[in-house]
From Swiss-Prot:
It comes from Buchnera aphidicola subsp. Schizaphis graminum (strain Sg). Part of the 50S ribosomal subunit. Forms a cluster with proteins L3 and L19. In the 70S ribosome, L14 and L19 interact and together make contacts with the 16S rRNA in bridges B5 and B8. One of its GO terms (molecular function) is large ribosomal subunit rRNA binding. Keywords: Ribonucleoprotein, Ribosomal protein, RNA-binding, rRNA-binding. This is Large ribosomal subunit protein uL14. Binds to 23S rRNA. Forms part of two intersubunit bridges in the 70S ribosome. Coiled coil: none annotated. It holds the Pfam family Ribosomal_L14. The keyword Ribonucleoprotein applies. The lineage of its organism: Bacteria, Pseudomonadati, Pseudomonadota, Gammaproteobacteria, Enterobacterales. The keyword Disulfide bond does not apply. One of its GO terms (biological process) is translation. Belongs to the universal ribosomal protein uL14 family. SUPFAM superfamilies: Ribosomal protein L14 (SSF50193). Transmembrane segments: none annotated.
Length: 122
């Protein structure tokens, strides 16, 4: 569960290393974001010649959470860290590579580009 002020790892090669959630999108009083939800982030740490710079405010989709996601068969998929993928204004990934595993739940949320770039889909 991601809320405001949560620090996330960035799981793509956009140039950002870490980001902070500043708003959970999808409703006026929505408090938490789960895997597949879109959030507003600010870049907290970036590499020198990346596509994004420190301090930029962008959209991102949550791809991994420590809380995990419950499947219909009762199993729970959990991860060791909270991670997101940076999106542009058209909600397409800024980076061209995705690092680490992602879940099948992104397919339901129409993020097929992220699923095709990911090295492992759980």
């Amino acid at each position: 569960m991601i809320q405001e002020q949560t620090i996330l790892n960035v799981a793509d090669n956009s140039g950002a290393r870490s980001a902070m959630c500043i708003k959970v999108l999808g409703g006026s009083r929505r408090r938490y974001a789960r895997i597949g939800d879109i959030i507003k982030i600010t870049i907290k740490e970036a590499i020198p010649r990346g596509k994004v710079k420190k301090g930029e405010v962008l959209k991102a989709v949550v791809v991994r959470t420590k809380k995990g996601v419950r499947r219909s068969d009762g199993s729970i998929i959990r991860f060791d860290n909270n991670a997101c993928v940076v999106l542009n204004n058209n909600e397409q990934p800024v980076g061209t590579r995705i690092f680490g595993p992602v879940t099948r739940e992104l397919r339901i949320e129409k993020f097929m580009k992220i699923i095709s770039l990911a090295p492992e889909v759980l």
